[in-house]
């Protein structure tokens, strides 16, 4: 774990008192359009200071929550499987410590580590997926772990009808046909 010099939106509670732990996953291993997702955790931290922290709907300040920013996981350069395993292990530790994990960063493929760890504790979990693409390919350019098949890997963990997709505008025809029987898209 590499501690960041900048925390996300005043998330400065100590680990022991926090009920939520945010961590970054800087990784760019399977990005196919434009690289740069590895910079997302730091940029999201920087830009978070421009956000409003008060919710008029809940009449609460986000800063009232006990949130610890753990920093960034050390990237497994060029090895998406190792990075996913690292995320899985860290998320599993957070859950065993009764912490709510929030991962920021990197590319879509990394979500598999968090999904697997959370599903082991909460097998009835569902995924709300907001994206332009289905990400439901089994294999993408001969790779089973990529940004283009992360939701297919999630389906392998969760099973049918546990994934709800919103905003989907494109994907391969076979992904849409497969989704009709296995996920919920709108």
Set out the residue ranges of the language-model regions.
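Conserved alpha-helical scaffold segments that buttress catalytic/binding sites
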Residues: 1-186
């Amino acid at each position: 774990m590499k501690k960041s010099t900048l925390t996300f939106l005043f998330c400065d509670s100590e680990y022991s008192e926090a009920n939520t732990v945010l961590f970054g996953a800087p990784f760019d291993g399977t990005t196919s359009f434009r690289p740069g997702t590895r910079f997302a955790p730091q940029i999201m931290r920087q830009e978070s200071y421009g956000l409003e922290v008060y919710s008029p709907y809940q009449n609460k300040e986000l800063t009232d929550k006990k949130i610890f920013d753990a920093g960034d996981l050390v990237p497994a350069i060029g090895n998406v499987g190792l990075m996913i395993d690292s995320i899985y292990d860290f998320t599993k530790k957070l859950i065993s410590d009764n912490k709510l994990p929030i991962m920021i960063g990197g590319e879509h493929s990394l979500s598999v580590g968090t999904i697997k760890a959370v599903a082991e504790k909460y097998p009835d979990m569902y995924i709300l997926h907001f994206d332009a693409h289905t990400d439901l390919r089994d294999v993408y350019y001969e790779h089973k772990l990529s940004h283009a098949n992360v939701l297919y890997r999630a389906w392998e963990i969760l099973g049918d009808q546990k994934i709800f997709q919103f905003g989907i505008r494109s994907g391969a025809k076979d992904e849409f046909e497969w989704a009709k029987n296995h996920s919920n898209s709108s």
